[in-house]
């Protein structure tokens, strides 16, 4: 489910903008094939499921599908079809990720619904595929529902701990605000919040003129610093006005905070072991928590599948 706070085994990691789905459904309804890029993450820090398949020994059991060079510094790509034995092993390993006891122990999440697959990219594409299927399902017989190609979506399954997957922080810059009032309101919003380092969430601010400092929020209710900050900023902007920009790179933040009515916040990069717990306990990541990798590392649209 792409609904916020859902307890399904496959979940969105960020809020789904429902207004984005109908225009996409309009395109998908009449499309005979899909060429999506939907990245779904599994939490496999020991690298036991996908990585062993990339060895030369494992590839000898597979049949080649294609091999080609790519444009725009994309390098080369080769695709292989798993043998029946390999595919069955992967299915068993993925099923084991959904074991309730393993889940509860791994995440200290006794009583929480099991999360197996977390959306990494293409959340709205998968949400559209799901919405189209729900629309089509009542028009099919139970037998047709079992085998109809629109029941499934083509996804790229990626280990969260894949070395090529790099999380980069997204910082905040606000314009058209009074920095002194904003900081005073921030401290007032969280009991015990104070200037300087301490126990809890530490958030770095940048004032006009380049002055930097740290605010500590003790006993935070959110899993991540960005959650603590974004909850406050959303409320502040709603009540006081102003504009927010989401920025990559600390140096860019510092150069933008040059006007007297601006302020910047530098956030730490989310670590990989924080992603699943945050979705499990907070329901979703705060908006613009992180970006994944550089543009030239992103996946090319290579595979298509029939959906009619």
Q: Residue ranges of each PLM-predicted region?
A:
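Surface-exposed, charge/polar-rich loops and edge strands
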Residues: 1-308
């Amino acid at each position: 489910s792409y609904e916020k706070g859902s307890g399904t085994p496959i979940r969105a990691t960020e809020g789904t903008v429902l207004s984005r789905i109908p225009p996409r459904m309009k395109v998908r309804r009449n499309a005979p094939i899909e060429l999506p890029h939907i990245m779904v993450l599994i939490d496999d820090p020991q690298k036991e499921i996908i990585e062993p398949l990339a060895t030369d020994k494992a590839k000898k059991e597979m049949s080649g599908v294609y091999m080609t060079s790519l444009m725009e510094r994309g390098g080369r790509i080769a695709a292989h079809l798993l043998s029946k034995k390999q595919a069955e092993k992967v299915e068993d390993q993925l099923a084991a990720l959904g074991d309730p006891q393993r889940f509860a122990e791994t995440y200290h999440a006794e009583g929480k619904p099991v999360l197996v697959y977390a959306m990494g990219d293409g959340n709205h594409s998968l949400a559209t595929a799901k919405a189209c299927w729900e629309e089509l399902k009542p028009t099919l017989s139970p037998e047709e529902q079992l085998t109809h190609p629109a029941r499934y979506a083509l996804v790229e399954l990626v280990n969260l701990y894949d070395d090529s997957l790099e999380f980069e922080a997204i910082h905040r810059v606000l314009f058209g605000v009074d920095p002194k009032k904003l900081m005073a309101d921030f401290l007032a919003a969280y009991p015990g919040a104070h200037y300087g380092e301490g126990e809890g969430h530490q958030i770095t601010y940048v004032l006009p003129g380049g002055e930097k400092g740290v605010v500590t929020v003790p006993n935070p209710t959110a899993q991540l610093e960005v959650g603590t900050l974004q909850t406050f900023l959303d409320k502040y902007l709603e009540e006081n006005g102003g504009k927010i920009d989401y920025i990559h790179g600390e140096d860019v933040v510092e150069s933008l905070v040059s006007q007297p009515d601006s302020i910047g916040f530098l956030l730490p990069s989310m670590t990989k072991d924080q992603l699943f717990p945050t979705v499990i306990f907070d329901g979703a990541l705060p908006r613009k928590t992180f970006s994944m990798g550089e543009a030239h590392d992103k996946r090319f649209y290579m595979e298509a599948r029939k959906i009619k």
